[in-house]
Amino acid sequence: DDWLTPWEPQRPQHLLDPTRDRDAFTSRCHARDRDRQMGVAYGFGLFVGGRFCGEVNINGIVRGAMQTATIGYWIDRAEAGHRYVAEAVAVLFRFAFEELHLHRVEICIVPRNTRSRRVMEVLDIREEGTALRFLEINGTWEDHVRYAITAEEWDERAANFAAQWC
């Protein structure tokens, strides 16, 4: 299935696919757990009707003067378009600002990924511009549209997010 291929960095050829290899999956889980313990990244599964169908992640947490992180997400094709990702990202914002006490969260999206950009539109997240050749996707350095929300914006909108999404 090529549903996510246009948006995801290529897995190095020497690494086994965690969706097809139990040991690779176990290693991935251990790495995610280490990241969580170190406070540099957190991953959460999306479940619909008890079935795992996607993930939302907060990655690259930087402390000190920045207090920032990036968010990534994906969902199975069968569940796309039902606003599950928007709901999950809203909950992740709450976690980022109210539990992790970050100051800024950023989401970077390939410009042609209209479904992912729609999530940002639905949540009314501020677009900041385009980062040229930001991330390598399938061997090509792709531009990314940058979206962000700060703690001040969260404080102004938290009640609305909670009422609509959380």
For the regions a language model picked out, list residue spans one by one.
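GNAT-family acyltransferases
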Residues: D1-A78, T140-C166
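Structural motif
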Residues: D1-D2, L100, D124
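Conserved GNAT acetyl-CoA-binding A-motif
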Residues: E99-C108
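Conserved catalytic-core motifs of GNAT/GCN5-like acyltransferases
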Residues: C108, R126-D143
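Alpha-helical hinge/cap motifs
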Residues: G72-Y73, G81-R83, H101, G129
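Conserved acetyl-CoA-binding loop-helix of GNAT-fold acetyltransferases
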Residues: W74-I75, G81-F95, T114-V122
